[in-house]
Amino acid sequence: MPPPPHIKPENVLKRAQELIAVGQAPAALNVLHEHVTSKRTRSSPIASLEPVMLLFVELCVDLRKGKAAKDGLYQYKNIAQNTNVGTIEVVLKKFIELAEKKVTEAQAKADEIQSSLESAAPSSNVEDLEAIETPETILLATVSGEQSRDRTDRAVVTPWLKFLWETYRTVLEILKNNARLEVMYQTTALQAFQFCLKYTRKTEFRRLCELLRNHVQNAAKYSAQMHAINLSDPDTLQRHLDTRFQQLNVAVELELWQEAFRSIEDIHTLLSLSKRPAKNVMMANYYEKLARIFLVSENYLFHAAAWNRYYNLLRQSAVALAAGQGTKKENPSVTEADMTKAASFVLLSALSIPVISTSRSRGALVDVDEARKNKNTRLTNLLGMAQPPSRAVLFRDALNKGLLKRARPEIRDLYNILEVDFHPLSICKKITPILKQIGADPEMEKYVLPLQQVILTRLFQQLSQVYESVELKFVYELAQFPDPFQITPAMIEKFIMNGCKKGDLAIRVDHTSGVLTFDTDIFSSAKALHSGSAAGSAESDVGSVQRLQNTPAEIARLQLTRLAKTLHVTCMYVDPSYNEARIQAKKAAQARAEAGAAKEHEETLARRVLIEKKKEAATDALQRKQREEETRKRIRTQQLQEAEKQRLLDEQREREKKRLKDEQDRIRQQELKKQLEELKSGVKGIDISEIDLEDMDANRLRAIKLAQLEKEKNELNERIRTTAKRIDHLERAFRREELKHIPEDYEAQKKRDMELYEAIKAETLKEAEEKHKEAVALKHRLSRLVPVFSSFRKEVSEKRHEEFEKRRKAAEREFEAKKKQRVKEVQERRRREKAEREAEERRRKEEEERAKREEEERIAKEEERRRVLAEEKAKREEERKRLDEIALRQKQREEEAEARRAARKSGLAEPPTRAAEPERPAERTAPRLNLASRTGGAPSWRERQAAKEATGAAPAPAPVPAPAAAPAAAPAPAAEAPKEEVQLPRRTGGYVPPHLRSGASASPAAPPSNGPAPEKYVPRHMRESSSSQPPSRTQTPPAPAAAASSDKPEGSPAPQKWVPRWKQQQQ
């Protein structure tokens, strides 16, 4: 298949504009959608792709194709997010602007349609944009032809409202959890909030809040992805907080209190993640909205606590602004009127906290239920308080901060009446004017009902302390409130029943006698006191009720306590020793405490150190566990990503296979249809209506075609044969008849041909004469122009020749100038190269001279080193000679001792003493090791150095004079023939006798040619030098050697050869 023709974005854009120009917007949208979602688009430049996307979103908005827009924008985000984020924002802003513009136009159109009707609400009454048409509306539209405003809006405005809502949701889904698109994400969320507020879209607002909440939860889940947002970043967290505060404001404006409370929880969660404190202006808005939520939910206890926190924040902001520690932008603007209003509401909300619960749907133990405790803990955390609030704590805090002075006078009087000087018989008369003032204020009117509950509670609590029974009529007269806030007897009875159900009141109502009887059972247990109720009641402790006198039950219950106190006081006055014993015990306890204070302090310090170590160990363990968890999480995330990537690849591979298979099937079906059409049009007599394409293939179709062609061929041949037979007989008859008329026809044809020839000839001659005349006339007419043409051509030639000469001379001048410039450049370059060569030559000579000096210095240093080595070597040789002499004397002594032992064993006479022994030559060194010779036969540097020293040294020293005792024995060894000995194989690294070493003669058994004594060791360089000298200069063997050898036994070896001791012992 050929490639698609529109690959470049410019071509696609041009093609789409052409389709739009001819009114084919859906086709243009399809072209743009295919190009945007194509894989080839990923390599396209962003600059050329942006106009395509702008036109794409414009067409999607015009045609209300939200799904196509979502697909294209997702693909465009994946392409451009790594290169250019700004273009994504431009396209998405354009998308939102176009959708908002369509909604505005739809509203204007609806107003136009309903201009004759009464003005109605600006928005439709459709509750859910995703469920516009209900069965009721369809039935109503069917049976009624009336055109109302709601129906007009539903038909005109609501579809565009739905599309705008889908636009916001699509953009938020595209921008979610992307740090590079975070600002655009927050801006879009704020625009969506304004959309819900402007058109009162409560259902869409709930969905929007849930959508944003899911995005934040997924941000922590997919934090390892590329470009994921980091909630630890202060700027990111601040943007999310701003969005949630706007969400809270819109929820309060729409009176969606459940969503407002969830928004409060979202804000509290984000604040707990923030590392820097929130701004005071934000927290003021937070506490104000929280107070409104608690008031709507009738949780008066936490409502009063929220007002308390709000007042504290206002006071802190005022102090910070007065001290210059903060800016007006970060702190709410506070005036004296604001502080008075806040103080009044704090006090009024605290007074409105019910003492008992007003809910009838709760059992007696509801307030101690675990769910209630968890809820109170959650609300306490939302307020940022360490412990749950109570009525007494709130009043104490208000008094400590001086709220009575700041509050309005009527609120201050109300506090004094209810909490300080409560009188049940005159309470209603005193409170009536205050309730009227509170009821006149719309904001404070909401507190009248809870105040009535508090007043009734106080009334019955104090009546139960004074009376045992009272008439119902008397109670109704006491509970009289001003006109708008009257309470009926039924409401009073309802209140009594609720208090009895909760255990806060013990009252029996007798309607027959019209009497209220208070419980006076002195043995009854204490009433259950519960903290906090569903309506936000306070903790009903005993101290919160003014005590007029003790009830009989309390007197019976506290009898033992009073007796113990009385006996204690009596003992103190009657028995002085009791008091002294108490004082002594106290002193002893103080002494013990002082004695153990130091030890306890040390133990405390040691315990503190141990605790710190445990904390560090726990912290290290926690950090290690967190690192391991992060590692496992990262590995798990990588595995999930790889699995997801593999799954996507498999799905893509399957989709590609399915697409190829579908494409092949489609092409096959098209080919089959095409062949069938060709078969139908080309071959007659075939009915293709009964052919099933599913069971048909190309071979079967070809067989059908061939069979039909064969059939047609046979029929055609039969018709041709029949026709030929018929024509053959007919033609034969015609020719027989023609033979009679052929001569006549020939003569007539010949005559017609001659006439036609003559006419054509005359016409040709006439035309030739006319053409000749016209040519001659043209020649005479043009011949007048030849001189003018020649002169004009000559002038043009001369002008062009002059111009050519001018250009040639200019070119020659330019050539000469460039030639001179080139020569100058070449000369300059050659001078520069010559200077460089001379400088290089100078540097080379200097380098050579420096190298020569260094070489001379090195040679001098080498000569000096060799001289020092030679001196050291000479010293070592002298030391070695001295050691050899000592070793030789030791050896002579050993030999003498060995000879004596041998003589004693053999029974011979004593061997010659040491005095008769000839002196050994002094020139002998340590035995040489049988080291491996150098490869190649070349002497080492030590050998060469020794040869040089031997050449320039003095002649060999004179031989040691022989003793006079044996002068005649000298020639005897020379005359004797040397004995042959078998040379033992040499072991590498072992000891080798001197006569077998490398310095000896070629024959190992023969004595040296120069004649020195075999026992005398001569260095190698001396042996080499002595071998080249004449025999006259060699040393003669000393005579005592021969004499000594003659004295030896016959079995001993020749005197010229040294025999080891172990061999001598064997012999």
Swiss-Prot record:
Location of the protein in the cell: Cytoplasm
GO terms (BP aspect): formation of cytoplasmic translation initiation complex; translation reinitiation
Keywords recorded for this protein, A-Z: Coiled coil, Cytoplasm, Initiation factor, Protein biosynthesis, RNA-binding
UniProt cross-references to HAMAP family, sorted A to Z: eIF3a (MF_03000)
Coiled-coil regions, chain positions: 92-121, 608-899
Annotated Low complexity bias: 965-976, 1025-1046
Residue stretches making up the PCI domain: 339-523
Record protein name field: Eukaryotic translation initiation factor 3 subunit A
Any GO molecular function: mRNA binding
Quaternary structure and partners: Component of the eukaryotic translation initiation factor 3 (eIF-3) complex.
Bias kind Basic and acidic residues: ranges: 617-632, 642-665, 795-901, 916-926
The organism's taxonomic lineage, starting at the top: Eukaryota, Fungi, Dikarya, Ascomycota, Pezizomycotina
Region annotation (Disordered) ranges: 617-665, 795-1067
One GO cellular component, as annotated: eukaryotic 43S preinitiation complex
Family to which the UniProt record says this protein belongs: Belongs to the eIF-3 subunit A family.
Pfam families: eIF3a_PCI_TPR-like, PCI
Function: RNA-binding component of the eukaryotic translation initiation factor 3 (eIF-3) complex, which is involved in protein synthesis of a specialized repertoire of mRNAs and, together with other initiation factors, stimulates binding of mRNA and methionyl-tRNAi to the 40S ribosome. The eIF-3 complex specifically targets and initiates translation of a subset of mRNAs involved in cell proliferation.
